Amino acid sequence: MNIYEFLKKMRRLINEGNRRFVMKRDGRYYYNILIEDFGISDTKAWEYIKTLNEHFLWVDMKPNYTDSSAFIFKRLINGVMAYIKVKIEEGENGEEVVCISFHRDY
């Protein structure tokens, strides 16, 4: 799936409510990371994710994973550079958008 197909499908699935965050990063819940790093709620984070486009796409030249189905984006949110990794996968109720990472870029 190319980036344009991915973004179109991602937005549709998010609008349908077929979305979720991974539960934790480094032992911290994403709800807390979003508030601490950006001052936003999980609902606002999904709004930011829906506005991602090909101009925010970031290509990792040394990926730590081989799963090519995830796309990485970087964008400013409230003055802080965010690292956002999302993919579409099969969930219990069909396809869903999974936000693997949404945190301050290091």
Regions found by a protein language model. Give the residues of each.
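Intrinsically disordered, low-complexity sequence elements enriched in Ser/Thr/Gly/Pro
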Residues: 17-18, 73, 83, 102
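Basic/aromatic recognition patch in beta-strand/loop cores that engages polyanionic ligands
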Residues: 63-89
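Enriched for short, Lys/Arg-rich terminal
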Residues: 81-106
